[in-house]
Amino acid sequence: MAVPDHWIPHAREDGEVIGWIDMHTAAPDLIPIDRLGRPLSAVSEWPDAEEALERRGLRFLMNRFRFEERTVRIRSLDDHRIVVTTAASDAVGDVGEEFVLDFPAGPELAESP
């Protein structure tokens, strides 16, 4: 799946998209959508949706996640897929297993506590 047409991109000052604002699903409320395609709490005002996305940002993508009982990290993502790996780093010898997931991320990819 790709980014739905009714998701409006929200970018940082440098132009990097950090999420979207869904104006359709919960209208008249707005749903901020993070970079993994996951909904945040609905809000009623556009500035509140932008603020929620700014707070969430991209930093959370550096966290560890759980996938199929494995600890993984996000290696790359775009508007069509998410690549996760069990490798601890991108060092040459640190191979690990890679998994390609559909975008948006489903519940099988969970943030580690």
Residue ranges and their predicted role:
Residues 31-33, 82-86:
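SH3/SH3-like beta-barrel fold
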Residues 42-43, 90-100:
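A short macromolecule-binding patch
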